[in-house]
Amino acid sequence: EAQIRSLDSERYTMLPCHSASQIYQEAGITELPMLLGFNLYNGWYGGNLGGFEEKLEELHKEFPHKPLLITEYGADVDTRIHSFSPVRFDFSCEFGSVYHEHYLPEILKRNYIVGAMVWNLNDFYSEARRNAMPHVNNKGLVSTDRERKDGYYLYQAYLKESPVLHIASKSWKNRAGASRDGKSCTQPLKVYTNADKVEVFLNGKSLGVYPVADKVVSVDIPFVNGKNVVDAVIEKEGREYRDQYVCDFKCVNVKNGFTEINVLLGARRYFEDRIAEMCWIPEQAYAEGSWGYIGGEVAPNKTRYGSLPASDTDILGTDQDPVFQTQRVGIEAFKADVPDGVYAVYLYWTELTSENKREALVYNLGNDVVREDYINRVFSVDINGVSVAKQLNIAEEYGSE
């Protein structure tokens, strides 16, 4: 520090730290730099989102005389994954949005936080990573092919003075959902804007005018089967601004207009296969006249900080890893009360347990899935009482990680 001051008295110096500030204090180095930075990931690698502002207050009490910066924060987002009950490490667009919607206002309201750096602007390659998109760190506000994620527009709504209006999840072109009547399915859709209110239209019909709080509003959209056009309209500075979202929606109902169903067992998330232009939807328990699983339980993905919503296994031979990373183990049957007819049934399997040990990734901060005791899993499959597979052993026939 003294050397830097002698060479350039105007240059600021900073020490970036992780959240365990006491380690740096005990080493006697927190008083050396002019600024202190902290990498904080409350609610992503562990804990909950509310722990972020608690940590900020704690750090301010520890270092009241130091300007503080958040030198890293972020959550991984795979733009193909969605969830209406988002949780940490599900890699959904919706959890990423919730994360930044929580962090950014907490940063802006505190004058002692003099700067913050999102980790990262762009997704980037990281060879040892697995999870939803192996070999990629997905914490960017922009994907590797420069697709802007929803969080990008949240920052614009907060930081730009010119009008901002953006319908979230615009890249989700192929949507689907369970429908009671086969004609419509209601799902929430967010709009980011720095206007006070926004009017939302579906296929030319107004759904109402909605007040905006903290630069975002969530609107329940009654999507119909087929093409949907959602328009958002604001007035700002005497001018009208519009944004539009177009998607194809498949209302899944086994009685009315049934054509297909693509289900992720063991999942609460949706996955868009953009190549096949199809959408996988979360599982549900079977009920008469409908569809769903019978028996079993969600495959555990245990870590030091609780269970994760999906395995972190790299599925070889595909880039559609999220299709294979959730399971319902011990399932007795899957039943769909579809009309009489001829159907094609595709069953996708993978073995997520393994005898092989693997090295934990240090930057996952304890969130690597703990290997369960290996089970030599063998099973058979019948469809409508007809045997289609006997004594399947996925690990033996195709291998495991």
Segments from the language model and where they lie:
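Short, solvent-exposed loop/turn segments in extracellular or other extracytoplasmic domains
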Residues: V212-V216, V329-I331
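Edge beta-strands of extracellular beta-sandwich domains
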Residues: G238-V252
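Solvent-exposed serine/threonine-rich low-complexity stretches and specific carbohydrate-binding patches
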Residues: N203-D214, A389-E397
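Exposed beta-strand face motif in extracellular beta-rich ectodomains
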Residues: G226-V230, Y343
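Exposed aromatic-hydrophobic patches
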Residues: V216-F223, F334, E401
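Beta-strand-rich extracellular modules
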Residues: V233-E237, T350
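Extended substrate-binding grooves/exosites of carbohydrate-active enzymes
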Residues: E1-V209, P222-F223, K236-E237
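Compositionally biased, intrinsically disordered or flexible polar/acidic segments
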Residues: C251-E401
